[in-house]
Design a protein with these regions (language model features):
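Catalytic cores of DNA base-excision repair glycosylases
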Residues: 1-168
Length: 170
């Protein structure tokens, strides 16, 4: 279950008021950070965010990594999140593979087996890389990435998919 944006906004504003820069967050102690996250749950995310800030300051000279490969080295950031950040922030042509996208790809490409299985996961990533590689060079990666997530969350839903509304129908 995802936390709603409307719920997060007041926490976000308060968090940024206290930690306006990566350096400010990196220099804080974990005990200083946690109260600003209290009420949101997912406390491992707060700890990872704090550790990310420290790594960015100490290993990347305070500059946010720009490639999905570098982003994936940060605490708590896996390949899909790294690719999403790189696509949204820097336009990198790097596919994502979150739960929604996995569902779209398994249904559209007829891939059987549980997406958490290594072989299935590898096949999905390979397909995603191929799709991006075969896309026009001027593909807006942020729009493509958001569109995939939206398609999986609003049309190609886990239960009661709205196949008649799917833009991928032939």
């Amino acid at each position: 279950q995802q936390t709603q944006v409307s719920t997060v906004l007041s926490y976000y504003e308060r968090f940024l008021e206290r930690f306006p820069t990566v350096l400010a967050l990196a220099e804080a102690t974990q005990d200083e950070v946690m109260p600003y996250w209290a009420g949101l749950g997912y406390y491992a995310r707060a700890r990872n965010l704090h550790r990310c800030a420290q790594v960015i300051v100490n290993e990347f000279q305070g500059q946010f990594p720009r490639s999905s490969e570098q982003l994936a080295t940060l605490p708590g950031i896996g390949p899909s999140t790294a690719s999403a950040i790189a696509a949204f922030c820097f336009g990198e042509r790097s596919p994502i593979m979150d739960g929604n996208v996995k569902r779209v790809f398994t249904r559209y490409f007829g891939i059987y087996g549980h997406p958490q299985k290594r072989a299935v996961d590898q096949a999905l990533w390979a397909l995603a890389r191929d799709v991006v590689a075969q896309s026009p060079v001027d593909l807006n990666m942020a729009a493509y990435t958001q569109g995939q997530m939206d398609l999986g969350s609003m049309v190609c839903t886990r239960s009661k998919p709205r196949c008649e509304d799917c833009p991928l129908q032939t």
